[in-house]
């Protein structure tokens, strides 16, 4: 006998396949623009979409919310990723399958370098791979690097808008409290030593998605920054 839950899952998968929908983000080819903004928090999608012309809610499934509209006549979308590398990499892989090819990660981070003040913009050029998702794609020797075209565009925009900004390396982690309360962790010595090393190396900020997004972008040959 097959459990009822298995039958239900199979029926959902078949329905998505028949409609051409991606399994997690629930969008299909034509639903999204080539350019996608990727916040972590689903609630931020509606706020971002308010800047679009003719914005429409396309999908709302799990942590993945997608709106599509237009900016200066160009079709663009916003899709949330949830927290961390696993869910972010799923969103990116499925958005690429749906036809998108240029992505901007937007969200909050924790400042590390003393020059990074609250409210400053941090443009990540690359990420320290302290998370586990990218290890499923390639050995640790391969770097997680943002696309240069996207980085340059973000820096140019920050300059034009007069924002205080910093461009450089960020730390990407899996455990929020492992970094913010390291002394409570069984491996506190390792976490603290690495944190101090990153500071000495000029790491700008700490967050939880960039490494996975940069890495999957490199693998899929799309632009991510």
Placement of each model-derived feature along the sequence:
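Active-site rim beta-loop-alpha module in soluble metabolic enzymes
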Residues: 145-200
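Glycine-rich beta-alpha junction loops
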Residues: 110, 171-177, 212, 220
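A residue-level signal for conserved active-site and pocket-lining positions in enzyme catalytic cores
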Residues: 41, 170, 217
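A C-terminal functional module that forms or caps the active site or interfaces directly
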Residues: 194-225
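Generic secondary-structure signature for well-ordered alpha-helical cores
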Residues: 50-57, 126, 155-164, 175, ...
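Metabolite-binding pocket within alpha/beta catalytic cores that recognizes anionic/polar moieties
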Residues: 9-153
């Amino acid at each position: 006998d097959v459990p009822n839950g298995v039958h239900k899952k199979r029926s959902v998968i078949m329905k998505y396949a028949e409609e051409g929908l991606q399994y997690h983000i629930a969008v299909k080819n034509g639903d999204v623009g080539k350019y996608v903004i990727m916040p972590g928090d689903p609630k931020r999608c509606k706020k971002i979409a308010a800047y679009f012309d003719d914005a429409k809610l396309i999908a709302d499934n799990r942590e993945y919310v997608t709106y599509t509209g237009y900016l200066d006549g160009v079709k663009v979308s916003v899709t949330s990723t949830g927290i961390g590398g696993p869910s972010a990499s799923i969103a990116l892989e499925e958005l690429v399958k749906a036809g998108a090819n240029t992505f901007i990660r937007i969200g909050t981070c924790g400042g590390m370098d003393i020059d990074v003040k609250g409210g400053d913009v941090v443009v990540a050029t690359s990420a320290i791979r302290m998370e586990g998702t990218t290890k499923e794609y390639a050995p640790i020797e391969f770097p997680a690097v943002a696309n240069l075209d996207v980085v340059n565009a973000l820096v140019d925009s920050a300059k034009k808008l007069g924002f205080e900004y910093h461009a450089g390396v960020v730390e990407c982690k899996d455990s929020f409290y492992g970094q913010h309360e390291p002394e409570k962790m069984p491996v506190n010595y390792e976490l603290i030593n690495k944190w101090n090393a990153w500071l000495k190396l000029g790491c700008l900020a700490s967050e939880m998605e960039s490494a996975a997004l940069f890495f999957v972008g490199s693998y899929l040959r799309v632009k991510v920054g």
